[in-house]
Amino acid sequence: KGKRNFSWRSDQAATLVYTVALDEGDPKNIVPFRDEVFQLQAPFDGAPESLLKTVNRVSRLEWANDNIAIARDRWFNSRNEKIYLFDPSGSGKEAKVIFDRNYQDVYSDPGNFVKNRNEFGSNVIQIQKGNAFLMGRGFTKDGQFPFIEKLDLLTEKKTRIYTSSYKEKKETISDYDPKKNEIITRLESPTLYPNYYRQNLKSGKLNQLTFFENPFKSIQNVHKEVIKYKRDDGIDLSGTLYLPVGYDKASKEKMPMIIWAYPTEFKDKSTAGQNTQNPNEFTYPYYGSMVYWVSKGYVVLDDASFPIVGVGTEEPNDSFRKQLVGNAKAAIDAVDQMGYVDRKKVAVAGHSYGAFMVANLLSHSDLFAAGIAR
């Protein structure tokens, strides 16, 4: 109940924005719109002005100029997200839904709007001749291919400007300049430390901006691959597999293994099985990384998929333990079939909800010899 989500319009000097729940803050109340967004201009002694109503809970507001703004809403139970184009000038134009999707469906993610800094030092959506621009991570069933897309705000027509074609490297687009048709991008591979480049999309010419060296050369030649496998109910799973330093793949010596994972809840099996791992990502150890164990003779399965799915009215946690054990068994089976792991010497590790996962796996299965619940 009441006003919430107070913020400032980034395209104006002093305009306050806030949200009011139209269902009294109770999701059980059935209403056509859950939230309404208002604005109040300085000196804040006038009547607030309604900007739009949203079907779900407002999650984000993005501003371009006096006549163009974007709102995003979400509803957790259905995982639905709507992206609205609206006119914040008080023209009375009805907000238009330009994207309506499952926010866990990474394959349909339209990306984020390209922004620049305005006279107030705030980031606003770039508009060029009635077009906005989107930068997407570009996950597909065939791999990750980041993209730039032009969106005509009048017709909603989308035009692909650029799609990454790298197959041996990972590309991450950091920024796009529509006027110059240039991107700032980062390139990396398992052994190539990430560096930044400026690229003209018309000519394709790359200009390297940074020249960082790999500080982790002791593990740069460690074998790394993204493996894909299935759970016993057919859901697609994946994980990033590392073999120990100096391991001879031809010998198929069975080694101890540690699995790092974090359970994720889904409402349908198709999104649960989507792959968001890129085999070309640089191997970057940090203080909590499991990758260090490759220097101690361990096989490491990092970021192993652990989906917990609840379809329809079923909640994911209704079958939490069964699905947890199914995920773990599928991961061990997959690496065992490759000939690398001693099944009697497998450990599992996780942080927070992942630590809860570890406790349940050690309590309700006999798959693991040890666990780290961080």
Where are these regions (language model features)?
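Conserved beta-propeller blade repeats
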Residues: 1-19, 23-26, 35, 46-88, ...
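Short acidic/polar mixed-charge low-complexity motifs
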Residues: 44-47, 57, 79, 91-94, ...
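Long, heptad-repeat coiled-coil alpha-helices that serve as cytosolic signaling/dimerization stalks
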Residues: 143-148, 347-349
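Short glycine-rich, flexible loops that bind phosphorylated cofactors or substrates
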Residues: 25, 110, 141, 192, ...
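Serine-hydrolase catalytic core recognition
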Residues: 31, 62, 72, 174-374
